[in-house]
Amino acid sequence: ALNGALTIGTLDGANIEIKDAVGDDNIFIFGLTAEEVEARRHDYDPYPIYHADPDLREALDAINSGMFSPEDPGCFRPVVDTLLSDGDRYFTLADFRSYSRAQEVLARTYLDQAAWTRKSILNVARMGFFSSDRTLRGYARDIWGVPA
């Protein structure tokens, strides 16, 4: 939300704080919560999601085919391997459908320029806490032990 950009993200890490600062209506949240991820971690398998979602399967198959890197067709295979063969550590595939729905809401919101502008202005007004100046001063003082 820095510089008025609206955030789309999962409800973890800094996005929790951003959501608290800007308000539920001014951020686009998708995906599993940290608690839901933890509950599913022991038996999560990305393959059923891949096989059940034609849009996701089409996207991953296109990436894996070399379509986006004809000069080096295997260039992006490690991405697909990480998501499928290596277990999708960050639950990216589990969040895909929710992300798609959030992106549709975001796109509709963008078409309503008055609503988009209002949300952008509110984000700017409520994001002061996240300024890089404040963050770097805190890092200098608390982590690096240097004057700021």
Predicted regions and their residues:
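Catalytic binding pocket for nucleotide-activated donors in carbohydrate/polymer assembly enzymes
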Residues: 1-129, 134, 138-148
